[in-house]
């Protein structure tokens, strides 16, 4: 099933301070992983792909 990344990322980023940045990275991760964890933070165990993507500095890429 196709996931609605815009909708899922709007939900995920609804409480983020850097909202635009959150949406951008969530969108990248959603397209790669076809999954966005539930809630606005945490719950990464639901989406291991999302949780394990790293940025160039080795930190978590996905919000």
From Swiss-Prot:
Coiled coil: none
A Pfam family it matches: GASA
InterPro entries xrefs: GASA
UniProt keyword rRNA-binding, yes or no: no
Keyword annotations of the record: Allergen
Tissue expression as described in the entry: Expressed in pollen (at protein level).
PANTHER family membership: EXTENSIN, PROLINE-RICH PROTEIN (PTHR23201), GIBBERELLIN-REGULATED PROTEIN 10 (PTHR23201:SF141)
UniProt similarity note: Belongs to the GASA family.
Name of the protein in question: Cypmaclein
Organism classification: Eukaryota, Viridiplantae, Streptophyta, Embryophyta, Tracheophyta
